[in-house]
């Protein structure tokens, strides 16, 4: 049973949220009721620049943080964290919306999972090829490894001179604690169905045969990374492989090598897209929007589960213990 204080806290928070949301609803452009309640799409469109040509808009989508599908949904406490499923939905909606003339991806990431990067890349490629909408990338402080992978199929790529990009390659890591365990007198008993069932186990060294197996996986994903750049940037495979040794590049260096089209910030990207479209459209930003359903769902979880945060931390730790292939730049 929840205590009286918890019920009062929930009611007070709900009243505050409803009042704040009502003010926001009145002062904002018209918004779909389903979206506001939280039963429809999970984003809102905010006008950031008003144009003189009406009818269509340019959409800005922000990708910030490690590209990883943590499985958690956005909440009041983690709206600043990257949410993979939510970003894919936003990208899909922007691609399908006939009122969106072009898309700008604001990218600031060291990369992340191979699968997650491939999912974003696929959607960007489909928008450019099937919808015939221009997709421009505006790189921030960092757009490395998976950050470059998802940018490769874009119509144009912009970066600041100081942007860190590149890091083209694949990495897979694990920790070997067998030596430490031996010093501490700890023994591990493993029963397995095949010789490679516990490959990359932390409790023993990797064998030569296992190194060969793992390297073939890394090489396969690396070849895919190279292909993505060849197709997206119109470069030869030889050119790409010379650049794709894992090193990082500044934005200026990336322009010189052909990995990036032009230097410039977000304002430059917006201006360039307007010129290429031949229209001064409104510029809108897609942002996650917490509706009433999201709020009450999150609040209920927190109140009914005292260990809610601990469960999230435990899930994250369990994920980090599992070696995965990554397009990730690790500083």
Curated annotation (Swiss-Prot):
Point out the coiled-coil segments of this chain.
none
Topology in membrane: Single-pass membrane protein
Q: Pfam families, alphabetically?
A: Peptidase_S49
Annotated gene: sppA
Enzyme class comes to hydrolase
One GO cellular component term of this record is: plasma membrane
Family that this chain belongs to: Belongs to the peptidase S49 family.
Biological role stated in the UniProt entry: Digestion of the cleaved signal peptides.
Record-listed E.C. numbers: 3.4.21.-
Per UniProt, subcellular location reads as: Cell membrane
Domain of life, source organism = Bacteria
Name-wise, this protein is Putative signal peptide peptidase SppA
Gene Ontology BP, a term? proteolysis
Its Gene Ontology molecular function terms?
serine-type peptidase activity
Residues at the catalytic site: 145 (nucleophile), 197 (proton donor/acceptor)
